[in-house]
């Protein structure tokens, strides 16, 4: 799915934004989730407070490679949440099998991996997600026809991918990990 389809999907979702916001408010607006101390440094993907301040939950927004998406699915199952097929689009709520906690999960395939938005009030799951180190597909996998040496300002799919997924991943890496990338993609990542 390219940026056009993503935007189309987003606008289709915007039609139900009010009801979805109400649904999220119903899921995460009641009891206050126990406070979670986020470490100063986190590996990718980053756990952050939700952007909706009235929600008592935390979120994870990331792009995962196939292997790490399967690891996330396993983690969710082991944490007591319902199983969702790892390669199918999903937009809904997962209930814990024995606790009063929930996960709102949105996932779809794009950029040679899986885009994931996960919102939860389950502190045990969140603590595991903070230590869950994962990676998006390599840039040359997400954009096989792109030569990073020819890129100036970014637009469209590439800009969205870079802002939403690649930059947070790149900034979470140490210098040694960054130096493992091909020179042209290293320079692209440092510049953008």
State where each predicted segment sits.
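Polar/charged low-complexity regulatory segments
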Residues: 2-192
């Amino acid at each position: 799915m390219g940026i056009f389809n993503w935007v189309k999907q987003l606008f289709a979702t915007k039609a139900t934004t009010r009801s979805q916001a109400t649904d999220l408010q119903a899921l995460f607006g009641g009891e206050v989730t126990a406070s979670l101390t986020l470490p100063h440094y986190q590996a990718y993907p980053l756990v952050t407070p939700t952007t909706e301040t009235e929600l008592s939950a935390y979120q994870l927004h990331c792009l995962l490679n196939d292997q790490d998406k399967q690891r996330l699915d396993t983690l969710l199952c082991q944490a007591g949440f319902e199983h969702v097929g790892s390669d199918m689009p999903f937009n809904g709520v997962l209930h814990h099998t024995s606790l009063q906690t929930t996960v709102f999960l949105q996932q779809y395939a794009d950029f040679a991996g899986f885009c994931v938005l996960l919102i939860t009030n389950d502190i045990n799951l969140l603590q595991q997600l903070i230590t869950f180190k994962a990676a998006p597909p390599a840039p040359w996998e997400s954009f096989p026809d792109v030569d990073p040496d020819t890129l100036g300002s970014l637009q469209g799919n590439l800009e969205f991918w870079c802002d939403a997924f690649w930059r947070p991943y790149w900034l979470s890496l140490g210098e040694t990990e960054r130096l493992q990338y091909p020179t042209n993609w290293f320079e692209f990542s440092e510049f953008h």
